[in-house]
Amino acid sequence: MKHLNIYIMLLGFSIFTGATFNLAKYTVGYFSPSSSAAWRFGLAAAVMLIILIFTEGIKKSQLRKNAVSYIVLGIIGIFGFNALFFVGLKYTSPVNGALIMGLNPLLTAILARIILKDNMTKKQVLGIFFAFIGVLLVITQGSIETIKTLSISGGDLIIFTGNVCWALYGVLGRRFVKDGTPLSTTTYTMVIGAVSLIVVSLFTSKPVSLSNIPIGVWGAIAFMAFFTSVLGYLWWNQGIKEIGASKTSLFFNLVPVVTMIISFAVGTPIKVFQVIGAVLVILGVLTASGVIRIPKYNTKEQSAI
């Protein structure tokens, strides 16, 4: 099969990212959310910076031109997203978190329409509808009474807000970064985000005796730093280069499935509404991306919005 190695890499990305929800839930049992995120991205940023130096090198003109954009993106997309991600996982399940994040490709499409004036096709609108129903099912736990009383988990709302930050990171990066490569943009924003997380952690986290932290927690942090944040990113961008962004983005929607399987394997019960929600989210993104085709009655698809 052509590009088999790329598909294997992207499957690895999905597995790494899916595992991250469970690992993050584990680490916040020992570290504060800000400390967990600071350790993860401090390590990842250092590795990414080394990779950048030995591949593309530090280009001062590019750095000066995009300095403000890198700072804003680092604060929104790395600091904002991950601070909310780790805090949210203290109050909701890894499965719910992954399912809510599964809405990201469609949320990005909405923000791209608003900020970049990108057109949205009919299949994208239909896909957004499916995914919205799926996420609504998850955060209301399948209860109509929850909708009536607006008694939605605070953790779910925090994760969703983090999702907005991550979507803004991609859209604003397209809008404001000039002449920056994916590697350089991600490295610089990751450094800004890591520094922000470390500073916040120093002022908000209670002192923890590192000698009392189980080796498994350090292993979880190392996994998230090196596999999810470094390898996952490199493989993701290799996929975009080889098979294109649209096909590559489909692998993000395996993440909730992986998280659900891992949660089930470690003894977490999976509820029917979570399974249905996962199916609807995946169905929505597959519809929006064109993998599931909508019958056409004319030869040219029209923009819906």
Curated annotation (Swiss-Prot):
Primary residence: membrane
One Pfam family here: EamA
One Gene Ontology cellular component: plasma membrane
InterPro entries: AA-Vitamin_Transporters, EamA_dom
Coiled coil residues, start to end: none
Source species, domain of life: Bacteria
Localization (cell): Cell membrane
Membrane topology, from the record: Multi-pass membrane protein
Keywords assigned: Cell membrane, Membrane, Repeat, Transmembrane, Transmembrane helix, Transport
Transmembrane segments: 4-24, 38-58, 67-87, 95-115, 125-145, 152-172, 183-203, 215-235, 250-270, 272-292
Keyword Ribosomal protein: no
All copies of domain EamA, residue ranges: 15-140, 164-290
UniProt key word Iron: no
Family, as annotated: Belongs to the EamA transporter family.
Protein name per Swiss-Prot or TrEMBL: Uncharacterized transporter YyaM
Organism: Bacillus subtilis (strain 168)
Gene symbol of the encoding locus: yyaM
